Each structure stands twice: as structure tokens, then as C-alpha cells.
Design a protein with these regions (language model features):
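A short, conserved alpha-helix within the catalytic core of class I
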Residues: 229-241
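N-terminal accessory regions of S-adenosyl-L-methionine
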Residues: 1-138
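Conserved SAM-binding loop of SAM-dependent methyltransferases across substrates and taxa
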Residues: 165-177
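A short SAM/SAH-binding and catalytic strip from SAM-dependent methyltransferases
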Residues: 220-232
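S-adenosyl-L-methionine
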Residues: 195-214
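Conserved beta-strand signature within the Rossmann-like core of class I S-adenosyl-L-methionine
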Residues: 244-256
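Conserved class I S-adenosyl-L-methionine
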Residues: 154-164
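Conserved alpha-helix/loop element of class I SAM-dependent methyltransferases that forms part
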Residues: 135-155
Length: 297
């Protein structure tokens, strides 16, 4: 009787192990891979070759790891493009602001670039508020320097030098910004930002990798980016953006052997003609010779 019937086994669904593996995701999903070796060496050496090496790692990761979880790639976490240092000053600013539903919405995690499980295991901070330290710090850069959502909404163009994973850009749009947002970064990092911000539905973001495409903005934001560039590139970038109205620059004093405090005071500030420049020390970030905000208004 059985020979009268044929049976077709239902194919079992194939599960992408990369989507369910516990975070962090190492290069090639292997803690002992060549990519991981490069990453560790770059971090330990931390010299002028750091970013050339990390660009290779990110390029390889983009080909072999899921973009849906790029925020828990080991490369992303190690730079870090996703901050996990829980500074109470930023947390205070964020929680105070979150009493306003506009800020609370901007701080709420969207789970783009991570799974809900990733958030719970790696980034979760509160039992009743799904946010991340990265989002709190992004908003903190604005609030610490006097940029509330009304001021952000009044702007038409914002330029960010080194956009991280795109959280500051996402925050700005969720605060009600409707203008054009330019992110200048390495192509390998732009790919991550574009995935994040396009998925989030932000249509007016320009991802640029050439100084030729830089435009003056109502606000330029450069958090640990302008002051990590080679000196000759800094000059080109600042000259291109010299007509920008306002700046927020966060920097640490010593990076790759360069005295950033001297560069800020002797090179950058003299180029800001007819503007008020103010430097504030961030005492809760004492590493690398001290950390500072410079505002130009």
C-alpha cells in the first residue's frame, strides 16, 4: 500500500546562525580570526595607522557579518562607535530631558542594527526605558552645550564629522529637525550609517567621503573626530567649513601623539573670525590628557 504514495519531506527552514549567536560578533564569527588579530593589534598600538587597519576590518565585516546586527560587531564596540561608558552627567541630562515626550521618543531605541536580545544583553540600562548609553550621550552632546529641540528645529543644515553609527543624526531628526544632514566619514563607516538611517526613514541625509562635498552648516558637530584626523586633513576640513555658523567639538588632549589642546588654541580658534569660542573641561572624562568641549557661536 505504501508504494502507492510518495512523500515529500517539508524542507526545514535554514537558520542564519549569525543572527542568533550571542553578542559580540567577532570578525568571521571567530575570536581567533585574522580580522580579530588586526583589531586587537590596532587597539593596542593605537597609532596613526589605527584607522587604516580598522577600515580593513570594517570592510571585511560588512561582507561577512549581518548588517542587522552591526551595532554588536566587535569592531563597532571596540572603537567604540557604540559607547558603553556610563557617565552620570550624561545620564542625568538624558533622564531629566526624558520627562518631555519629545526627548523621550528621541532616546527610545529603534532596534535598527541590533536585535531586542542584543539590547537586553549588551546595551540595556533601565527596566522601564529601552534606550542605550550611546543615545543618551548623543543627546547629551546637544543639551550640554545649549542645543534644545527648538534650536535644532530652527536649523536648515547640520554637518557631522565622523557620524559613528548614526545615532546623533537619528536623534536630531526625531527631535524635529527637517533640514539636510551631512555626515563626512570613511566609506566603510558610511555603509553602516546608511543602513541605519535609511532603514529609519530619514531621507535628507547626505553620506559624503570627500572634502570636496563638504558644505558650511548652521551647526557642525565633531565629537572625537576632527581631532583624530591627520593635521593636513584637519586644515582642509576646517577651511571648507569655515563659514559654518556654530560648532560643537569634543576632543581629548592627546591622540596619536598629537597635542590637540595646542592645535585647538593655536590653529583652530584663530580661524573662527568674529565668533565666540568657549572651552569646557569634562572632568568626568579625565583620560588622554583630559577631555573637552569646544563651542563656537
Amino acid at each position: 500500500m505504501s508504494e502507492m504514495f510518495s512523500y515529500t519531506a517539508r524542507p526545514s527552514s535554514v537558520i542564519d546562525q549569525r543572527m542568533i549567536a550571542p553578542a559580540p560578533l567577532f570578525p568571521d564569527m571567530n575570536q581567533n580570526s585574522e580580522g580579530m588579530r588586526k583589531l586587537v593589534q590596532a587597539k593596542q598600538t593605537n597609532d596613526e595607522n589605527y584607522w587604516s587597519t580598522m577600515r580593513e576590518v570594517f570592510a571585511h565585516d560588512a561582507e561577512t557579518l549581518p548588517l542587522q546586527r552591526f551595532k554588536v560587531w566587535m569592531s563597532t564596540l571596540s572603537v567604540p562607535l557604540m559607547s558603553q561608558a556610563r557617565h552620570s552627567e550624561y545620564i542625568r541630562l538624558g533622564l531629566d530631558a526624558a520627562q518631555d515626550p519629545v526627548y523621550r521618543d528621541a532616546l527610545t531605541e529603534t532596534y535598527i542594527g541590533m536585535t531586542e536580545q542584543d539590547h537586553q544583553m549588551v546595551f540595556n540600562m533601565f527596566s522601564d526605558f529601552p534606550t542605550t548609553m550611546n543615545r543618551i550621550q548623543a543627546l547629551g552632546h546637544l543639551l550640554f552645550n545649549g542645543y534644545d529641540y527648538e534650536k535644532i528645529r530652527s536649523m536648515k543644515t547640520i554637518v557631522e564629522l565622523g557620524g559613528g553609527v548614526g545615532d546623533l543624526c537619528d536623534t536630531v531628526y526625531r527631535l524635529g529637525f527637517t533640514g539636510d544632514y551631512y555626515i563626512y566619514d570613511f566609506p566603510e563607516i558610511s555603509k553602516l550609517q546608511e543602513y541605519h538611517l535609511t532603514t529609519a526613514g530619514h531621507e535628507n541625509v547626505k553620506f559624503i567621503n570627500s572634502t570636496d562635498s563638504l558644505v558650511a552648516g548652521d551647526l557642525v558637530v565633531a565629537t572625537w573626530s576632527l581631532t583624530e584626523m591627520p593635521l593636513d586633513l584637519r586644515d582642509v576640513v576646517v577651511d571648507k567649513l569655515q563659514d559654518s555658523k556654530e560648532w560643537i567639538v569634543a576632543y581629548s588632549n592627546k591622540i596619536f601623539g598629537i597635542d590637540n589642546d595646542a592645535w585647538i588654541k593655536e590653529t583652530f580658534i584663530p580661524k573662527m573670525k568674529n565668533k565666540t569660542c568657549e572651552i569646557n573641561a569634562l572632568d568626568f572624562m579625565p583620560w588622554d590628557g583630559g577631555t573637552f568641549y569646544l563651542t563656537v557661536k
